[in-house]
Amino acid sequence: MAAEIRTFSCLNDNFGYLIHDVETKATASIDAPEAGPILKALEREGWQLTDILITHHHGDHVGGVAELKHKYNCRVVAPHDKTTAIANVDLRVANADVVKVGNLLARVVETPGHTLDHISYVFDTEKTVFAADTLFSIGCGRVFEGTYPMMWDSLLKLRALPDDFKLYCGHEYTASNVKFALTVDPDNAALQARAAEVAKLRAENKPTIPSLLGDEKRANVFLRADDPSVAARLHMKGADAAAVFGELRERKNKS
């Protein structure tokens, strides 16, 4: 099976993503921040939208659903938590469910913390994960609805994926994430290398996504909250990893 992925900008700093099954011509949008850029990308490629895979209920991830549903009558897949206001949903999914996009298989991983309903979509064959606002390149999402231990557990689920998986996240926050990370992990050679790469990409107005999970494991301080050297930098030697993660997130919130 072969898949093609297209990345483009939506709203102020959201990413839009289309994943296309070459064999069946099925195409899914990962979230739908706004309809316009998604429609343009579909037109540019000559693809028809068959599915929208929603990761969580925030407006900047579902704002385009109604218009796209009206135009294509596509299937809308969303987290099983029905307490969140996501309209036009055809299929509710939970942890370990598998969603078919043509012949492509997306495995659902519940990754709560940013929101309680947040899920990520893992395409194992394509070695790709769409993590939306749980894991960013060199960062992670704010914890709005969950707890720090909950978010840390979600990050561990994503960290457990193989190093050669590609990470596609919800926002272009990498430059600001790098700036913060260097304040708490300044001697990390992998982070320094990523910082140089990000600076070059942004200077050329290119996206910093996708990144490789192996690189994130080495350079993303939020994935290293259980590393004693990170705890030591925060003067938290011996502290629980979730507590270290919480301190990192609090510092990032204030940065």
From Swiss-Prot:
Which InterPro entries does its entry note? Clx_II_MBL (IPR035680), Glyoxalase_II_hydrolase (IPR050110), HAGH_C (IPR032282), Hydroxyacylglutathione_Hdrlase (IPR017782), Metallo-B-lactamas (IPR001279), RibonucZ/Hydroxyglut_hydro (IPR036866)
Annotated positions binding Zn(2+) 2: 60-61, 133, 171
Q: Where does Zn(2+) 1 bind?
A: 56, 58, 114, 133
**Which reactions is this enzyme annotated as catalysing?**
an S-(2-hydroxyacyl)glutathione + H2O = a 2-hydroxy carboxylate + glutathione + H(+)
Annotated coiled-coil positions are: none
A Gene Ontology molecular function term for this protein is: hydroxyacylglutathione hydrolase activity
Q: Which domain of life is it from?
A: Bacteria
Q: What class of enzyme is it?
A: hydrolase
Pathway this chain belongs to: Secondary metabolite metabolism; methylglyoxal degradation; (R)-lactate from methylglyoxal: step 2/2
Q: Which cofactor does it need?
A: Zn(2+)
Q: Which GO terms describe its biological process?
A: methylglyoxal catabolic process to D-lactate via S-lactoyl-glutathione
Signal peptide segment? none
What does the UniProt cofactor note say? Binds 2 Zn(2+) ions per subunit.
Keyword annotations of the record: Hydrolase, Metal-binding, Zinc
The EC code for this enzyme is: 3.1.2.6
**Subunit architecture:** Monomer.
Family recorded in the similarity comment: Belongs to the metallo-beta-lactamase superfamily. Glyoxalase II family.
Function, please?
Thiolesterase that catalyzes the hydrolysis of S-D-lactoyl-glutathione to form glutathione and D-lactic acid.
Q: How is this protein named in the record?
A: Hydroxyacylglutathione hydrolase
> What gene does this protein come from?
gloB
